[in-house]
Amino acid sequence: MKNTDIRSFDLTQRTIFGLLSQTLFGAAYTPEPDVDWTEVYQESENQAVRLQTFANHHLIPDIPDELREKIRRYLAAAMLRNARIHGEHTYVHTLLTQNGIAYSVLKGAGSACYYPDPLTRAMGDVDFFVSREDFDRALALFAREGFTASGQDHICHVVLRKKPIHLEMHFEPAGVPDGEVGEKILSYLSDLRACAVPLKSRLTTCMRPCDFHHGLIMLMHLQHHLLAEGIGLRHLCDWAVFVNHFRPNEFRETFEERLKAVGLWRLARLLSLSAALYIGLPEQDWMRDDPEDGEIAGQLMVDIVAGGNFGKKNRQRAYEGLFISNRGKDGVGNNRLKEGFGALNRITRAKCPFTQRVPILLPVGWVAVLLGYLFRNHKRNQTKGHVSAADAYKKSSARQQLYRKLGLYEPEL
């Protein structure tokens, strides 16, 4: 069974893989000679895994003193921030439950609880789900609490802000595709709130999804960002520790049949295999189903690392994604020029609302959007660097070919 040799990754990347395997799964690991620890620190930041990478920094004598002090300060500040965000989960829980609104968090503390130490998971904002029937009532409730709502035209959530709290209230998880597969996924999620599980720890009290719902939500979220800007190692770590908490064959029994029906089982297998090959997740037989799976899992890992967390390492990837897919909603099999043209139309309608009211003016909107792109690119040339649409189109080809191998939202009958 052919795998992408770990030596295909550079020393900095291999070091991060080894440290992650040590932190997440207790694997024995000794760094190779000549590691540039400043580069490791920077790359772990790009991947949003500094906490997991340096959780055991005291066991690494080669880290320079100045960098070690920087690491200590970062770990202390990051864990304090994470503890605060766990507390915000409790705040949301208390507010909603005291007012009779059933809900479930999405990811967040629900992902952190699978880590050996939940504080080592880099936390973002608080995402949670309420039903469409309760949505307006919940919105009014947060308004009375002093939150400002924005993004009401978003496809699946509203943003709620009251400094320093940042919330995303969903009426639908991100990444649900169009068509019959999307309808089946929504049927899977119809009892999301009813099946939610209480999470009570030293850090938080909230309602989290059951294992099946959590895995499904993560897979949709992962493909949603993978096809666009990229996911980075943080998301792979979330997936790996989740898979690791199942007993042997329990994961397969829980997920295989239902995920095959919506075309996500192959993604689940190959993500798990990537984590097993490179960051220490114990491998199980269900992770491989084809002699080429090891090679595909390696290619997937190369892609994950290349993008960084939400494309932090390569801003052009988001533009490449416009030629690959509409974040998976219509699959990844379309012609890239057709995808790019579709993306231009979606962006134009969003940025120039008059084109929705008067469709004949859509070409005028195209001009406005393209002029805006040229203006922003001019400014980037002076600051962060040029983003080439032609280069994005060219590089999108290899990525699309890889993603087609994942069979996203293509049911396995």
For the regions a protein language model found, what residue spans apply to each?
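Conserved NTP-donor binding/palm subdomain of two-metal-ion nucleotidyltransferases/polymerases, i.e.
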Residues: 2-124, 130-413
